[in-house]
């Protein structure tokens, strides 16, 4: 290849030829083309910190259009309204998905209602609910059953503090990987956030720890829950929990996390770790990006740059997906385009999981259910790559009315996931 680029020594003498001027011009362009190629490659390498080679087909990626993905939204409504069982999912948030090897899809849900839906519209204000659940979707896209603990209780069981306060687990991203590195047996690994009951601004729980659950295949039985990281920060807002996204790529799984500065009205800082395939449940195998290289100490993790100010950037539940050779990060903008807060989904792109991330680019204001009258909030945008295609990506988001809990009982649509399909293009 070096010789073809004209960098080898000992060239044969040049010969006079009727096409000489053209050939001479070609010879002059040869070194210039090589120089330009080198500069382009150098620029791409700079796009991927740490000296890692860029993705060969990395391109600046933007969302060019979107439309409602009604089939998925309606499937969750159908399943939730089905009263053939009164101990399964009728609404929830924290909705994430992962494809299983046999063609099924495992959906993960955080706070989940289990109850009867009355006339397809409302639920009893005293409905039973649990801190987490799983949902199994068939190969043909039909939700079939809810995964719970005995009781019914949460699928991933909770704990309690020494003084009796509730400690619960919220499931986040999940992946299918070897049971151990190199093993032929596959299991599901689910990232969990451990949280405990607290007061304002921690009404949604004080962040405590990152854990990983191992779930068997194909029967989806919770086998174990392993502690991964227990942040030592005295300020809960500075504690980084991992798992808002997990992307397998080659020999590694890249796990994304964030602190919780959004509790104080600021953007969260985004972090990334990587783990060898098959080792997610082994805390000793985790490596944390410090801005230049991968470190064994989570305390040395450095935030990835997102947004232009501390008030605009990611929330703690952003999502990351790969599309071709480009990494795409989507989040509810912590600042919003006009400073109004969590209203707009924005995107960033990068040539590697560590960034640098380019953006933000406004994507959409997620549509809310009819009749929400401006009370409802859309949050937790999550990519569902297995439902996308070459030209696009399915994005789900949750809906809630945090200032009026009774509203989600009067109208069950106000606490169910909704979906849109994003068209992606190179910009």
What residues fall within each predicted segment?
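Secretory targeting and sorting signals
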Residues: 3-4, 26-51
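N-terminal regions that are enriched for targeting/export leaders
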Residues: 49-185, 190-194, 206
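Beta-propeller blade signature
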Residues: 120-143, 203-220, 269-278, 344-353, ...
């Amino acid at each position: 290849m070096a010789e073809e680029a004209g960098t080898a020594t000992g060239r044969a003498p040049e010969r006079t030829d009727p096409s000489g001027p053209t050939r001479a011009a070609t010879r002059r362009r040869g070194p210039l083309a090589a120089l330009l190629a080198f500069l382009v490659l150098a620029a791409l390498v700079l796009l991927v910190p740490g000296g890692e080679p860029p993705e060969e087909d990395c391109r600046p990626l933007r969302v060019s259009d979107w439309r409602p993905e009604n089939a998925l939204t309606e499937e969750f409504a159908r399943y939730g309204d089905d009263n053939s069982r009164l101990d399964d999912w009728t609404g929830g948030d924290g909705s994430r998905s992962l494809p299983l090897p046999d063609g099924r899809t495992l959906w993960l849900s955080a706070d989940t209602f289990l109850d009867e839906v009355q006339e397809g519209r409302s639920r009893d204000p005293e409905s039973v609910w649990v801190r987490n659940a799983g949902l199994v979707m068939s190969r043909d896209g039909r939700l079939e059953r809810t995964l719970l603990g005995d009781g019914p209780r949460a699928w991933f069981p909770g704990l309690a503090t020494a003084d009796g306060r509730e400690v619960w687990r919220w499931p986040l991203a999940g992946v299918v990987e070897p049971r151990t590195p190199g093993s032929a047996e596959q299991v599901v690994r689910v990232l969990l956030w451990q949280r405990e009951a607290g007061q304002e601004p921690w009404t949604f729980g004080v962040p405590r720890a990152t854990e990983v659950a191992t779930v068997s295949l194909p029967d989806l039985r919770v086998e174990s829950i392993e502690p991964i990281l227990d942040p030592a920060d005295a300020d809960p807002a500075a504690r980084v929990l991992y798992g808002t996204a997990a992307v397998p790529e080659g020999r590694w799984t890249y796990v994304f996390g964030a602190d919780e500065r959004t509790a104080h009205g600021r953007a969260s800082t985004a972090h990334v770790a990587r783990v060898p395939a098959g080792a997610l449940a082994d805390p000793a195998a985790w490596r944390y990006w410090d801005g230049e290289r991968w470190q064994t100490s989570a305390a040395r993790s450095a935030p990835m740059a997102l947004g232009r100010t501390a008030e605009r950037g990611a929330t703690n539940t952003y999502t990351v997906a790969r599309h071709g050779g480009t990494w795409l990060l989507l989040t509810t903008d912590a600042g919003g385009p006009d400073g109004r807060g969590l209203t707009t989904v924005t995107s960033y792109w990068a040539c590697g999981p560590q960034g640098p991330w380019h953006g933000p680019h406004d994507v959409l204001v997620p549509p809310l259910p009819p009749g929400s009258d401006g009370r409802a909030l859309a949050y937790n945008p999550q990519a569902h790559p297995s439902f996308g295609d070459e030209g696009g990506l399915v994005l789900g988001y949750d809906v809630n009315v945090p200032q009026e809990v009774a509203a989600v009982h009067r109208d069950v649509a106000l606490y169910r996931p909704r979906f849109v399909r994003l068209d992606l293009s190179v910009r």
